[in-house]
């Protein structure tokens, strides 16, 4: 039974998305339908969590908007409404859930960039 479920889910999973992890700064291009208009809305911020597996996987992106108001948005990872995901920076973190960033403001909310040797693969 599990093999049947896994094979059906495999059809709906996307393979065109780049690998990213919590702490990375990403720009998600999300298709928004307003009335009859369809437009692509970019949302840029830090990934504070990834959860789930298979087609149910989601990730949450946090950014600080105008006047210091934090905005978090949760996206289904395999949604057909996601046009593309750009990884802008790889953050150096030691946690899977970065909820502590909610209490931090300004420079305290910055994350160090994860460095890597030239030519190596970065997860």
From Swiss-Prot:
GO terms for molecular function: structural constituent of ribosome. InterPro entries: Ribosomal_bL19, Ribosomal_bL19_CS, Ribosomal_bL19_sf, Translation_prot_SH3-like_sf. One of its GO terms (biological process) is translation. Keywords: Ribonucleoprotein, Ribosomal protein. It holds the Pfam family Ribosomal_L19. Gene3D superfamilies: 2.30.30.790. Belongs to the bacterial ribosomal protein bL19 family. This protein is located at the 30S-50S ribosomal subunit interface and may play a role in the structure and function of the aminoacyl-tRNA binding site. NCBIfam families: rplS_bact. This is Large ribosomal subunit protein bL19. The gene is rplS.
């Amino acid at each position: 039974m599990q093999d049947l479920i896994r094979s059906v889910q495999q059809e709906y999973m996307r393979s065109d998305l780049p690998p990213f992890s919590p702490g990375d700064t990403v720009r998600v291009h999300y298709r928004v339908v307003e009335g009859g208009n369809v437009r692509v809305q970019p949302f840029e911020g830090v990934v504070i969590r990834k959860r789930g597996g298979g087609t149910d996987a989601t990730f949450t992106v946090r950014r600080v908007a105008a006047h210091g108001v934090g905005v978090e948005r949760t996206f289904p990872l395999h949604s057909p409404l996601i046009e593309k995901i750009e990884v802008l920076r790889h953050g150096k973190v030691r946690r899977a859930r970065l909820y502590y960033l909610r209490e931090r403001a300004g420079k305290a909310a910055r994350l160090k960039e994860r460095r890597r040797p030239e030519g190596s693969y970065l997860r």
